[in-house]
């Protein structure tokens, strides 16, 4: 069992049950999945950019990314319906817990001038999205082997019913949220 999952069972569940007065342990919010997305505008001109980003994302997550395609044609961005414009990976189970553990304890502390993540990025349904400006904060990525610095969006999908519950849940699992 991953260290984060153990922490969830031993510390987070009792603390959340105490604070929110849940009657059943199944009411306690849990992490359902983590979705990592890289939107790539440059893939329109440079088709090889997708392959390099795919290798980076595969190295970070340990899972094969899925290519996302344009839903509609947009002349202003020079994209047509069906063009490859990004990548995404959905992590669940033990891979998800391992990734979140690495993100909180290894990757985020490597961000320059890091003072915590924004507490305002909740969507109203208990999900949290974190934007990263570069993939280099992950120790698996070798600085000499990358072709371009790319950002990514990481969405934490929780079973929380409100943002307040999700905020407390993420704080308890160790997410360094800035005080708002």
Curated annotation (Swiss-Prot):
Family label: Belongs to the universal ribosomal protein uL5 family.
TM region(s), chain numbering: none
Keywords: Ribonucleoprotein, Ribosomal protein, RNA-binding, rRNA-binding, tRNA-binding
SUPFAM superfamilies with a match to the protein in the record: RL5-like
GO biological process: translation
Assembly notes: Part of the 50S ribosomal subunit; part of the 5S rRNA/L5/L18/L25 subcomplex. Contacts the 5S rRNA and the P site tRNA. Forms a bridge to the 30S subunit in the 70S ribosome.
Record flagged with keyword Ribonucleoprotein: yes
Species annotation: Desulforudis audaxviator (strain MP104C)
Name used for this protein in its record: Large ribosomal subunit protein uL5
Domain of life (superkingdom): Bacteria
A GO CC term attached to the entry: ribosome
InterPro entries: Ribosomal_uL5, Ribosomal_uL5_bac-type, Ribosomal_uL5_C, Ribosomal_uL5_CS, Ribosomal_uL5_dom_sf, Ribosomal_uL5_N
Any one GO molecular-function label of the UniProt entry: rRNA binding
Pfam families (alphabetical): Ribosomal_L5, Ribosomal_L5_C
